[in-house]
Design a protein with these regions (language model features):
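Glycine-rich portal/gate segments that line the openings of hydrophobic small-molecule binding cavities
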Residues: 37, 54-57, 64-107, 158-163
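Hydrophobic ligand-binding cavity/cleft-lining segments
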Residues: 17-67
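A short, structured loop/turn motif at beta-sheet edges
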Residues: 39-43, 88-92, 111-121, 163
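Bacterial N-terminal signal peptides that target proteins for export
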Residues: 1-10
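Solvent-exposed, polar/charged alpha-helical surfaces in well-ordered, non-transmembrane soluble domains
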Residues: 43, 47, 53, 147-150, ...
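Beta-strand/loop substructures that line and gate deep hydrophobic ligand-binding cavities in soluble
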Residues: 101-151, 158
Length: 163
């Protein structure tokens, strides 16, 4: 079972908790999964993109580690001076992060999996609660996020394949 799938299942396994610890009403959860084939071995591809603030380059914005150690569980990053995310899980070739804003309870996983000894695949999974987004804006929001992360994967792929 993929790391992102396991985390999503754990999130849905019981009532979500707010920062105060009280039960939250059921949400409207969405998962967006993007994949990209990479012409590089998995370990080499991961080595090129594993930095927790590398996302700043992929999104063409700023990113800074504001707490903890880069790449370690518990590290907190701030993207574009406003979005704060914490690493909640990691493996040798992946990490999962969560937004600390409980409004949409989003988390994402970036992972690389081997396909052959010389090729691999990036998988970027975003999972979030769209209940706080007005119903008439949800489809456009999902489309915007999917396009943004498709661009992120294209940038990651280029970095991983660069000599």
């Amino acid at each position: 079972m993929k790391l992102a799938t396991m985390i999503a299942a754990a999130t849905l396994g019981g009532a979500a908790l707010t920062s105060a610890g009280s039960a939250k009403a059921a949400g409207d959860y969405v998962s967006i999964v993007q994949e990209a084939a990479v012409n590089a071995p998995a370990a080499q591809a991961w080595d090129k993109v594993k930095g927790y603030c590398a996302i700043g380059a992929w999104l063409k914005t700023t990113c800074e580690i504001t707490a903890g150690k880069d790449g370690e569980v518990g590290a907190l990053r701030k993207i574009a001076g406003r979005v704060e995310e914490v690493i909640v899980a990691k493996t040798a070739t992946s990490y999962t992060y969560a937004d600390i804003n409980p409004a949409i309870l989003y988390h994402g996983t970036i992972e690389v999996v081997p396909v052959t000894p010389k090729t691999s695949k990036f998988i970027y999974t975003l999972f979030f609660d769209q209940a706080s987004i007005p119903a008439e804006q949800r489809e456009a929001n999902r489309t915007r996020r999917a396009a943004m992360f498709a661009n992120v994967l294209a940038t990651m792929k280029a970095a991983a394949e660069a000599k």
